[in-house]
Amino acid sequence: MNDAVKLNSIFTKLSKKKKPKLLGRGIGCGKGKTSGRGHKGQKARSGVSINGFEGGQQSIYTRLPKRGFKPIRKNLYSIFNVGDVQCLMEAKKIVKDSIIDKELLHKLGFIRSVKSKIKLLNKGKLREKFVFHVDFASEAAKRSVASVGGSVEILS
């Protein structure tokens, strides 16, 4: 039998793991008195820290200009390609002539929620006929689906 060290034979006992040094237990212990915080000053005090403070130098977020904004009601949608449908059919997760809608895409893990919006794009090649129920679709995707006999229904 081979006497080589194997991953399943290596183990460490809990007592062998190094414990962190206790702070503030008298000046003889090495981390006593000031407990590694130095003498006085703002950083030595408890409960005080200034986020982004760079020692008097102008901070990075005040040096850089303000740019853009984040809209509160941003219209997010998931992108779905016609080539993805062909891959799903080849993997036998969907059958030919089936309806591709939000419930099916959610079940297959393409979208997080049934409430999210879907946009159909024309990346990839579609060789089978499918019916799509999506919120948005590019003109090229509509032509691609129609060329194989399928249809795209835009949900309102």
Swiss-Prot record:
Residues 34-43 have a biased composition (Basic residues). Part of the 50S ribosomal subunit. Gene3D superfamilies: 3.100.10.10. HAMAP family: Ribosomal_uL15. GO terms for molecular function: rRNA binding; structural constituent of ribosome. Residues 25-48 are annotated as: Disordered. GO terms for biological process: translation. The keyword rRNA-binding applies. The gene is rplO. It holds the Pfam family Ribosomal_L27A. This is Large ribosomal subunit protein uL15. The lineage of its organism: Bacteria, Pseudomonadati, Pseudomonadota, Alphaproteobacteria, Rickettsiales.
